[in-house]
């Protein structure tokens, strides 16, 4: 018998977060409680011209595979990719996402749980869509991912 998913409800969030520039350009954001973590779903719809420009300027920022296995909910956020073409170490895509959320959700411990394959470019101004984020905000719920 399959486990039922916990009920998702709208969680409170700072007006500064909702009013930040990434969500003013034809995008929307939903912030929801999920067990002891916050799920942030973002669907950003930039114009084709803007999207093409970002692709040309940041070709190395494309995400080609998921960060972790959705079924096991593994935490796989602290890895660093080696860039052998430039002979230097660069941040992985999850590190970029975490850095973005740390700037926008202050004083929260950010944990990237997963994200989808079909992401737009990741940079410091735009967070990609389909990002599942956990944070340390205490919601007085079980601190476990086993209920998913």
Swiss-Prot record:
Please give the name of this protein: Uncharacterized protein YFL012W
What is the organism of origin for this protein?
A: Saccharomyces cerevisiae (strain ATCC 204508 / S288c) (Baker's yeast)
């Amino acid at each position: 018998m399959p486990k039922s998913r916990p009920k998702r409800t709208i969680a409170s969030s700072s007006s500064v977060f909702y009013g930040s520039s990434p969500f003013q350009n034809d995008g929307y954001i939903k912030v929801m409680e999920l067990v002891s973590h916050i799920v942030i779903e973002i669907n950003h719809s930039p114009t084709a011209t803007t999207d093409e420009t970002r692709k040309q300027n940041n070709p190395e920022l494309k995400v080609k595979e998921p960060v972790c296995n959705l079924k096991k909910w593994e935490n796989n956020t602290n890895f660093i990719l080696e860039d052998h073409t430039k002979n230097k170490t660069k941040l992985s895509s999850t590190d970029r996402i975490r850095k973005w959320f740390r700037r926008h959700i202050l004083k929260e411990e950010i944990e990237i749980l997963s994200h989808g394959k079909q992401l737009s470019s990741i940079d410091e101004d735009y967070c990609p869509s389909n990002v599942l984020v956990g944070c340390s905000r205490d919601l007085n719920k079980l601190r476990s991912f086993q209920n998913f």
